[in-house]
Amino acid sequence: DLKRLLAYSSIENVAIIGIGIGVGMLGLTYGNPYVAVLGFAGGILHILNHSIFKELMFFAAGSVYLKTHTRNMELLGGLMKKMPYTGLLFIVGSIAICGLPPFNGFIGEFLIYAGMIMGIPASEISLFLVLILSIAALGMVGTMAMLCFTKAAGITFLGNPRTECVEHVNEDVPRVMLIPMVILAFLAFFIGMFPQYFISIVMWPVSMLVNVDKYAANPALDEVFKNTFGLILSDFSWFFLIFFAVVAVMFIVKLIVNRKARISNTWGCGYNRLNNHVQYTGSSYANLFISTLKPLFKRVSHIKKPKELFPKEAYYELEIEDIEEAYIVKPLVMWDEKFLTKFERIQNGNIQQYILFGL
C-alpha cells in the first residue's frame, strides 16, 4: 500500500526529529552550546522539511490512485511512460526524503550529524557512547529509507505494467494537480540549495530553547551557525547540482546522437514464455533485507515449481507477517478498543451535557 508506506515513513521522520531534539538536550545537559544549537536547529529544520517533501509524496501517491484506482504497488509498474511528470516529482520527493543532496532532506540531517560529531571530542564516556550509537542508528535509518523509496519509485513507475490497472492510463493528471507538486519540489530544491537563509530562520526558536545570553559573549558560536555551516551546506549543494547537470547533459547528448530506442525482451535463462509478471516486485526487492531480520518476521511461502520441459504453470507466493505488530501492537489496540467502548454512553448527542463535561 503506497500511502501506508508513506504513513510509516512519517514515523521514521518523527524519530529523526526526536534524535535532533535529543542531541540538543544532551548539549544543554553537558554545557556544550555547539551540540545544543546544532541538534535543535537540525530537528526544527527537519520539521519544516518533512512538511514539504511528505506533502509532495502524498500528492503524487494520490495522483497515482486517481489514475489507477489502486494503492497496491505490486499491481502497478510502467507508470513513468504514462505519468512522466508525476513520476519525476515522486522521484524528487524520494531523493529529499532519503536525505540526499541537493534537496532539503539533506540539510536537517546534516546539522544533526554535525551536532553529534562535534560533541564526540569533548564528551564524557557515557555521552561518547550515546553519540556513537546515535550516529550509527541515524545512518541505518537513512540506509533503510533509501531501500524503501527506491523500491516504491521503482516498482510503481519503472518496468512494465503488471496488471490492467495501468493499461488504461493514457495521460498524466491535470495541471491543477501538478502545480502544487511542482511548487513543493521547488521548495525542497531551494532549501537544499540555499540552506543558510533557513538556518537563520530556525535560529529564532532555537534561541528560545538555548540560553543565548549565556553564550552571547562567544563570537565563534555565531560565526559557526550563521556562516560556516551555511556555506558548507551551500558548497555541498552546488557540487551535487553541477554533478547532476553534467549527468543531464550526457543524457541529452545520448538522446540526440541515438534517437532510436531499442526494445528487447529480458533474458529469461532459456524460458521464452515471459510476461509482465516476471519482474521484480516490492517483496522480492526487499527480500534480502527481510532475510537478515528473520526473528522479526514470519515468512509463509507457497511454491509450485516448473517440472516439465515446457511448463504450463509455475508460481511463487510469499506472505510476510510482522511479529511485533501481530503479537504486541494489535493485542494492545484491541484491548484499548474494548476499554474505550465502555465510555460510548457519554456520546449521547446532548450538547448541554458535553458543555457540562467541559466545565
Protein language model regions, located:
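Transmembrane-helix bundle segments that line or gate the permeation/cavity pathway
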Residues: 101-106, 139-164, 187-213
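Membrane-interface segments at the starts/ends of alpha-helical transmembrane spans
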Residues: 36-38, 119-134, 217-238
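Predominantly late transmembrane helices and immediately cytosolic-facing juxtamembrane segments
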Residues: 54-58, 131-170, 233-264
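Interfacial and helix-entry/exit segments of alpha-helical transmembrane bundles
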Residues: 7-17, 64-120, 128-142, 165-190, ...
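Aromatic-capped, Gly/Pro-kinked transmembrane alpha-helices
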Residues: 197-241, 252-359
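Hydrophobic alpha-helical transmembrane segments in multi-pass integral membrane proteins
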Residues: 18-31, 98-101, 187-197
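Alpha-helical multi-pass transmembrane bundles of energy-transducing inner-membrane proteins
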Residues: 2-72
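Short amphipathic alpha-helical coupling elements at transmembrane boundaries
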Residues: 74-81, 115, 155-159, 291, ...
